[in-house]
């Protein structure tokens, strides 16, 4: 049975994307992910969410350290599409992967070990990212 390398669940009530990443990606996975994120954002907007208010919770605790090609493709896609959420909380457990994420982190991104802390930051009314 193939492993699903990511799941994306739009939560219109919170203007939030809940994303789970797992495993080792290839550059084609990054493109599949980009398309899935675009669909999920469109779903939120269709349900009344404003693009500039969308936040994202990315659970990357089950993802492996990625190749440089995958990291570069991921970063390029995020910048190219302009689909940067208002806030991006990333859940990590691996110190090695944390260093990779920190290298490509966006200004509005924070890294967390605990989901409750990530959600509190994402959903706070404070507009400072």
Q: What is each residue range found by the language model?
A:
Residues 1-129:
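Amphipathic, Lys/Arg-enriched alpha-helical "gate/interface" segment within cytosolic domains
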């Amino acid at each position: 049975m193939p492993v699903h390398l990511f799941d994306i669940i739009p939560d219109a009530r919170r203007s939030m994307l809940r994303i789970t990443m797992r495993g080792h990606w290839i550059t084609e996975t990054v493109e599949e992910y980009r398309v899935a994120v675009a669909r999920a954002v469109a779903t939120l907007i269709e349900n009344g969410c404003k693009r500039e208010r969308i936040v994202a919770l990315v659970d990357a605790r089950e993802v492996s350290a990625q190749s440089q090609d995958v990291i570069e493709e991921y970063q390029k896609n995020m910048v190219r599409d302009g689909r940067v959420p208002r806030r991006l909380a990333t859940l990590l457990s691996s110190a090695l992967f944390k260093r990779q994420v920190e290298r490509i982190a966006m200004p509005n991104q924070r890294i967390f070990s605990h989901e409750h802390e990530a959600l509190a930051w994402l959903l706070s009314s404070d507009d400072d990212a």
